Amino acid sequence: SIELGLKRFHIDVGDGKFINRVLNVENKVSYIKELNQSNNIHVHLMTMNPHHGKDKSYINRYSNLGADRIGIHRKSITNRNEISDALVMIKSYGKEAGIFLEVDEMVDENLLNTIKKHNINWVVLMGVPVGFGGQFFNEQVLFKAITLRKFALKEKRNLKIEVDGGLDRDNIIMCKKFGVDYLAGWSLVKSSNIGEYKKNINIIKKNLK
């Protein structure tokens, strides 16, 4: 990916509790940063209470490894009153804090108020249920993207919208039309053949121009 000129990476982290899989990717994050410090890493924390443990928290660990953006799920915070604590912690490390919106969550006043309160400029819309691969894309994501884009324009906010999961060569074009900035989907490009892998990336780049 890096050899092909890609500079932005979405990295999943799982603790086996919030999702059933354990995804420990500390070495991967370190490696990407070591290759080029300008590589931009989005860390997707699918972990329970990622702010707990202070110096041993997931937020602390991945901040120190060089993550540029760290996003959390509000459902992963046992005490909803601590959502603010987690976002503040991310920002205290000089990182961009983000919120992941799950398939069954809507763009509501609670979300918009949190965005304004903590000056959140990155929201990720899940296109599939969290923690599961190979799922069908939920088209409600497109309407959520429109709602967020209208909100951002009204508030004159430079909000970056990302879609994660369920993407294919057709719906990525729709996502772009509906105001999405970033697309995270390994299934779009993955291949055991390096030639095919490069071809897939080039096709996507061409389609999104």
Q: Which role does the model predict for each range below?
A:
Residues 8-27, 72-76, 128-134:
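Glycine-rich, proline-tolerant flexible connector loops at the mouths of alpha/beta enzymes
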Residues 22-44, 88-102, 140-161, 202-209:
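Alpha-helix-loop-beta-strand connector modules within alpha/beta enzyme cores
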Residues 1, 12, 62, 123, ...:
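Conserved, mostly hydrophobic/aromatic
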Residues 70-78, 124-135, 178-201:
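Glycine-rich phosphate-binding active-site loops on the catalytic face of alpha/beta enzymes
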Residues 100-141, 147:
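Histidine/lysine/aspartate-rich catalytic loop segments that bind and position anionic ligands
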Residues 1, 49-64, 104-118, 166-183:
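Catalytic cores of alpha/beta
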Residues 17-50, 54-55, 172-188:
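A short alpha/beta connector and helix-capping loop motif
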Residues 9-11, 39-45, 68-72, 97-101, ...:
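Hydrophobic faces of well-ordered beta-strands that scaffold small-molecule active sites
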